[in-house]
C-alpha cells in the first residue's frame, strides 16, 4: 500500500509515461492522486510493534468442447478436467498464443454476469454442474458475503477451453461500490462481453463500465440477456446502446420469440435458426431453417449486417455491389476486423438462466474478440529515462514484462499477486524486478486460479493471467519485469473514496488484530483507505459507498475475528479555488548559528473539474536554484491534503512558482519547503476558496402511483430532476442529481414511501460547489473539533 497510501505529485515529466497503445497517452494529471484525505501513513511502516501506537490504546483442455457450427444436432460433451495449457516442458505451449482470449464479463448489477459465467464453465467442461447465484452455489462468487447477498463483490479469475482456444475469464462486480474491480480487470484484458438485461436495457452502471472499456480501448461484444423475462425487448435494448452509449451496434442474432415463448436465436452469419429444447440443461440444441414468419425480418437485418462489414474489405465491397454476398468465413473475418478496431459492437441475445444462447456466445468470443497478437505492442517507459518509450511484443521470446493488477489474501498460501503476462516467460523460483520501486522479488509459486481454488504451474507464458505467491513489496498497478530489461507499464487510476466512517475495536485486545486486518484489506483494495485522526482520536475508514464499507467491516469480523463499533457515515468533501491569486512569501528565521531563508512567489490558478493538482515552475535565471525547487514542490504537496476552510483535500489547483530569491548560506531545501507552506495558506485564502461535495447520479424506478412522493422527496434532498422515462409494467424512471450528503439511509425512506415496490441506483457523477450556508456549518464544525 505504500505507494497508494501516499500523495503523489505529477509533474510534466512524470505525466508522459506511456502505456498500452490502445489507450491514448495523456499529459493531463490524474485528480485521483491528490484527493486523499489527511495524509495516510504507509501501511508498510505499520510494523507489529507500532500497531498499538497507531490505533491508540484508549479503546484441462477438452477437445470435445466444440462450436455449434460443426453439426446440425448438437450435444456438447462435458467433462471435468485438470490439464491446463502449461505443459511439463517449460519452453513449449499446448495452446498457441493466437488461440488465447483474455476476456471480462461486465454489466450493471443483476444483468446476469455470474450466471452467464457459470454456464460457460459448465458447457466448456470446467465445472460438472451449474452453480446458481440465488442458491449461493456459484463457483465465481466464492466469498461468504457474495453467497449470502447474491452479488459479486470481488473480481474472480478462471481459465477454460472452447473449440481448442484457451479462454481466461474475469467475472466482475456490477455494483457501483466495487467499480475498482472492473477498472483493474479491463486494464489487463484484451476483450469483453457486455451484458444487458433485456427488460431494463442500458442501466446506469452499464454506462459506467462501458466508459471504462472505452478508456482502455477494449474491444467488446454485447449479449442481451434474460430474453425469457416478462417485458423483454431486444430491439429497445439495441436502440439504447445507440442513444445511451453512443456505440454502433451490429446485430448478428435475432431472438425467436420472447418472454415465455423465447425458444432460440436466428444466426444471421449462417442464416440459420438455433433452437434449444430444454434438454440436457441446454447442452442440446437444433440448427434448423429460419421460421417462415421471421424470414423477411432476418433478410433485412442480414442485409444491414453485410452492408456494414463489407466496408472493411475492398474486394468484398466490389463483390457485394455486383450482387455476390460474402461467404460465412469472410463474414466472420470482417466482423472480427470491425470488432477489434471498435468500429462496431456485435450484438447477440439469449437467456443464460434458461440455458439458451451461451454456446453461440462462446463461439463469438473465439471468432470476434482479439488474441494478444491482434493488439498493438505494449508500450512502457524506461525507469531511468521516463520520456523514452519501450515496446514489448506479445511473444515468449521477448524479455518478461507483466502488470500486477490485484492482491488477494489466501488463508492457505498467503498474499497472492495477480499478474497479466504481456511478454516473455516466468518460472517459479525466478527473480523479477519491480520496476516502479527498483526492487528485486523472488517468485515463490506460480498458481493458476479458478475462483478461490488454485493449481500450481511451472511456468507462465505471454498472454497468461497468473497468481504469484511470495511477493512482498509489489502492489496493485506496479510492473514486474526482467531485471536486465526494465520497463514501466502504465499504471491504473484508482477511484478516490467518497464516504468515510469512524471505527474502533470493541475490546482493547483487538487493536492489533484490527490494524493487521485493515492493512491487508487496504493492500487488496486501493479504493479503500484508512487513517488515524489524532485530532479526534479515531481511526477512519474510507470507501466508495455504504455497501463497500459494510463489506469491509463484515470481513474484519469474519476473516480477522474483530468486532468493531462503527460511527455514522460522513461525506468526503473537497476544497478548491475560484480565482487566480499570486502571493509573495518570505520565510526568515535567525536564532544563532545558521539561519533559514527562502523567498518565493507562487501563483495559484483554478483548473477544470477533475484535474487534480499540478505544479509548474517558471523560474528563470536561477532566481530559485534548481536544487531548492523540490522543497517548494514538497511543501505545497503536503498542504494539498489539508485545505484552509475545513481541512479537506484541495483539488483542481495549479501552483506556479514564478519568482524568488535565496541566501548563499541560510537557504536550504527545508527553508523553501516551509516557505511553500506559508505561501499556500496565504495564496489559497486570497483565491476565493470554496468547498465541493460529491454529487450522485440517482435513478429511481417506481410505480406511477408513487411518482409524486418520490419526486418530492428528491427535491427535499437538494435534488435536481433531470428527466423521466417509462419502463414495462407501468413503472416510471426518475433520473436526478442529488448530493451524497442527502442520500444516507435513502433505501429505507424509499421502501417506506413505495411499500417496497421501488428501487434505485446511485453512482458518483461529479463534485460541485457546496451551498454557502452548508459550507459555513461544515467550517464551524471543523473548528469546534480542532478546538
UniProtKB/Swiss-Prot annotation:
Coiled coil: none
Pathway(s) of this molecule: Protein biosynthesis; polypeptide chain elongation
Listed Pfam families: EFG_C, EFG_III, EFG_IV, GTP_EFTU, GTP_EFTU_D2
Transit peptide: 1-86
Polar residues composition-biased segments: 14-24
UniProt KW Protein biosynthesis keyword: yes
Signal peptide (from-to): none
One BP annotation, GO: ribosome disassembly
GO molecular function: GTP binding; GTPase activity; translation elongation factor activity
Top-level taxon in the UniProt lineage: Eukaryota
GO cellular component, one term: chloroplast
Transmembrane domains' residue ranges: none
Compartments reported by the entry: Plastid, Chloroplast
PANTHER family xref list: RIBOSOME-RELEASING FACTOR 2, MITOCHONDRIAL (PTHR43261:SF1), TRANSLATION ELONGATION FACTOR G-RELATED (PTHR43261)
Family to which the UniProt record says this protein belongs: Belongs to the TRAFAC class translation factor GTPase superfamily. Classic translation factor GTPase family. EF-G/EF-2 subfamily.
Protein name in the entry: Elongation factor G-1, chloroplastic
UniProt source species: Glycine max
Amino acid at each position: 500500500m505504500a505507494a497508494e497510501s501516499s500523495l503523489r505529485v505529477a509533474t510534466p515529466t512524470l505525466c508522459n509515461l506511456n502505456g498500452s497503445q490502445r489507450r491514448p497517452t495523456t499529459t493531463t494529471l490524474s485528480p485521483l492522486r491528490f484527493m486523499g484525505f489527511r495524509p495516510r501513513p504507509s501501511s508498510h511502516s505499520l510494523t507489529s510493534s507500532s500497531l498499538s501506537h497507531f490505533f491508540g490504546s484508549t479503546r484441462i483442455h477438452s477437445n470435445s468442447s466444440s462450436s455449434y457450427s460443426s453439426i446440425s444436432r448438437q450435444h456438447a460433451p462435458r467433462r471435468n478436467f485438470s490439464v491446463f495449457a502449461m505443459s511439463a516442458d517449460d519452453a513449449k505451449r499446448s495452446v498457441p498464443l493466437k488461440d488465447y482470449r483474455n476476456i471480462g464479463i461486465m454489466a450493471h448489477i443483476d444483468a446476469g454476469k455470474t450466471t452467464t459465467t457459470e454456464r460457460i464453465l459448465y458447457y466448456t467442461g470446467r465445472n460438472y454442474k451449474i452453480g446458481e447465484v440465488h442458491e449461493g452455489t456459484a463457483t465465481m462468487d466464492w466469498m461468504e458475503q457474495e453467497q449470502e447477498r447474491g452479488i459479486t463483490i470481488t473480481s474472480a479469475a478462471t481459465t477454460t477451453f472452447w473449440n481448442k482456444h484457451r479462454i481466461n475469464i474475469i467475472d466482475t462486480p456490477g455494483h457501483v461500490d466495487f467499480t475498482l474491480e472492473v477498472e483493474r480487470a479491463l486494464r489487463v484484458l484484451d476483450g469483453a462481453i457486455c451484458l444487458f438485461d433485456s427488460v431494463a436495457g442500458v442501466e446506469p452502471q452499464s454506462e459506467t463500465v462501458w466508459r471504462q472499456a472505452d478508456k482502455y480501448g477494449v474491444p467488446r461484444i454485447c449479449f442481451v440477456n434474460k430474453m425469457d423475462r416478462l417485458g423483454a425487448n431486444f430491439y429497445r435494448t439495441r436502440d439504447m446502446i445507440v442513444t445511451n452509449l453512443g456505440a454502433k451496434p451490429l446485430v448478428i442474432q435475432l431472438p425467436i420469440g420472447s418472454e415465455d415463448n423465447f425458444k432460440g436465436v436466428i444466426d444471421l452469419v449462417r442464416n440459420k435458426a438455433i433452437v434449444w429444447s430444454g434438454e440436457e440443461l441446454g447442452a442440446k440444441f437444433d440448427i434448423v431453417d429460419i421460421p417462415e414468419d421471421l424470414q423477411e425480418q432476418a433478410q433485412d437485418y442480414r442485409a444491414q449486417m453485410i452492408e456494414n462489414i463489407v466496408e472493411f474489405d475492398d474486394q468484398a465491397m466490389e463483390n457485394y455491389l455486383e450482387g455476390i454476398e460474402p461467404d460465412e468465413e469472410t463474414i466472420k473475418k470482417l466482423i472480427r476486423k470491425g470488432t477489434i478496431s471498435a468500429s462496431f459492437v456485435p450484438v447477440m441475445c439469449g437467456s443464460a438462466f434458461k440455458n439458451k444462447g451461451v454456446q453461440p456466445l462462446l463461439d463469438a468470443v473465439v471468432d470476434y474478440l482479439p488474441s494478444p497478437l491482434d493488439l498493438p505492442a505494449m508500450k512502457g517507459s524506461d525507469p531511468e529515462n521516463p520520456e523514452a518509450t519501450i515496446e514489448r511484443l506479445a511473444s515468449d521470446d521477448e524479455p518478461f514484462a507483466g502488470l500486477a493488477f490485484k492482491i488477494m489474501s489466501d488463508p492457505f498460501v498467503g498474499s497472492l499477486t495477480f499478474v497479466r503476462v504481456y511478454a516473455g516467460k516466468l518460472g517459479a523460483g525466478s527473480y523479477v524486478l519491480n520496476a516502479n520501486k527498483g526492487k528485486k522479488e523472488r517468485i515463490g509459486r506460480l498458481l493458476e486460479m479458478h475462483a478461490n481454488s488454485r493449481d500450481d504451474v511451472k511456468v507462465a507464458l505471454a498472454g497468461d493471467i497468473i497468481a504469484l505467491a511470495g511477493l512482498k513489496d509489489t502492489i496493485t498497478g506496479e510492473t514486474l519485469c526482467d531485471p536486465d530489461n526494465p520497463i514501466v507499464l502504465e499504471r491504473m487510476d484508482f477511484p478516490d473514496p467518497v464516504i468515510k466512517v469512524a471505527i474502533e475495536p470493541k475490546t482493547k485486545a483487538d487493536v492489533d488484530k484490527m490494524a493487521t486486518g485493515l492493512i491487508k484489506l487496504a493492500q487488496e483494495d486501493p479504493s479503500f483507505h484508512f487513517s488515524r485522526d489524532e485530532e479526534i482520536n479515531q481511526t477512519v475508514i474510507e470507501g466508495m459507498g455504504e455497501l463497500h464499507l459494510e463489506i469491509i467491516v463484515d470481513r474484519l469480523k469474519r476473516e480477522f475475528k474483530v468486532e468493531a463499533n462503527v460511527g455514522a457515515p460522513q461525506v468526503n468533501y473537497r476544497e478548491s479555488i475560484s480565482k487566480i491569486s499570486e502571493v509573495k512569501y518570505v520565510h526568515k528565521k535567525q536564532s544563532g548559528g545558521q539561519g533559514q531563508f527562502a523567498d518565493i512567489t507562487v501563483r495559484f490558478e483554478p483548473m477544470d473539474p477533475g484535474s487534480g493538482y499540478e505544479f509548474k515552475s517558471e523560474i528563470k535565471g536561477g532566481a530559485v536554484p534548481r536544487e531548492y525547487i523540490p522543497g517548494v514542490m514538497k511543501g505545497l504537496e503536503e498542504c494539498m491534503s489539508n485545505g484552509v476552510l475545513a481541512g479537506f483535500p484541495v483539488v483542481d489547483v495549479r501552483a506556479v512558482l514564478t519568482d524568488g530569491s535565496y541566501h548563499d548560506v541560510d537557504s536550504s531545501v527545508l527553508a523553501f519547503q516551509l516557505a511553500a507552506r506559508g505561501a499556500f495558506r496565504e495564496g489559497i485564502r486570497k483565491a476565493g476558496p470554496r468547498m465541493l461535495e460529491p454529487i450522485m447520479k440517482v435513478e429511481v424506478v417506481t410505480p406511477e402511483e408513487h411518482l409524486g412522493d418520490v419526486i418530492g422527496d428528491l427535491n427535499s434532498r437538494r435534488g435536481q430532476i433531470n428527466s423521466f422515462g417509462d419502463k414495462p409494467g407501468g413503472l416510471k424512471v426518475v433520473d436526478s442529481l442529488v448530493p451524497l450528503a442527502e442520500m444516507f439511509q435513502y433505501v429505507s425512506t424509499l421502501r417506506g414511501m413505495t411499500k417496497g415496490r421501488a428501487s434505485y441506483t446511485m453512482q458518483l457523477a461529479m463534485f460541485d460547489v457546496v451551498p454557502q450556508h452548508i459550507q459555513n456549518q461544515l467550517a464551524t464544525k471543523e473548528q469546534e473539533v480542532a478546538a
